[in-house]
């Protein structure tokens, strides 16, 4: 795996996971803390991320992003329980309490965001209008992964576009040209 990543970088191209790792590393070295949570965030649902390595001999988890530089910002990657509503609510609160941290919540599959829809409707898209309190929570919603079925593959981006009003959220579909 590590050799494959090195080969990608030598070739001048990067897949999504490599670009994401480079972005996280850059933010950490510049002093911005990063917190990522979701059901399978360390490894990545599609085995693409590999932010954590498990040593089967010692039963220890190693997170290389935590060891880039002694002066770097804090990095947390958390594999959460299967309670989208509860975990997204916690991460929303975390983003309010620590607005200088890049706080990300990732749905394991696109349709898993359904379980947190109340949190999105009542808090995330309306917190600034209701309480004058902006949130920097980033939702990572896998979308368009064919082969998982029509529901499992859809994060329902149209639903988020309908929630956009007065600059309350940004909906981005990050892809390659």
List each model region and its residues.
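Flexible, glycine-rich loop/tail regions that form catalytic "lids" or insertion modules at the edges
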Residues: 1-177
């Amino acid at each position: 795996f590590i050799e494959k990543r090195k080969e990608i970088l030598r070739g001048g191209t990067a897949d999504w996971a490599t670009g994401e790792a480079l972005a996280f590393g850059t933010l950490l070295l510049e002093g911005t803390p990063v917190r990522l949570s979701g059901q399978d965030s360390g490894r990545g649902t599609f085995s693409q991320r590999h932010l954590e390595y498990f040593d089967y001999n010692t039963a220890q988890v190693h997170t290389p992003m935590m060891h880039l530089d002694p002066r770097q910002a804090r990095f947390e990657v958390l594999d959460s329980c299967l309670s989208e509503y509860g975990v997204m609510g916690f991460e929303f609160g975390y983003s309010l309490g620590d607005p200088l941290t890049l706080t990300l919540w990732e749905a394991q599959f696109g349709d898993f965001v359904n379980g947190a829809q109340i949190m999105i409707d009542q808090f995330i898209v309306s917190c600034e209008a209701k309480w004058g309190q902006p949130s920097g929570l980033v939702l990572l919603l896998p979308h368009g992964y064919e082969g998982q079925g029509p529901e499992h593959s859809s994060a329902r981006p149209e639903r988020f576009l309908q929630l956009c009003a007065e600059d309350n959220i940004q909906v981005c579909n990050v892809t390659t040209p």
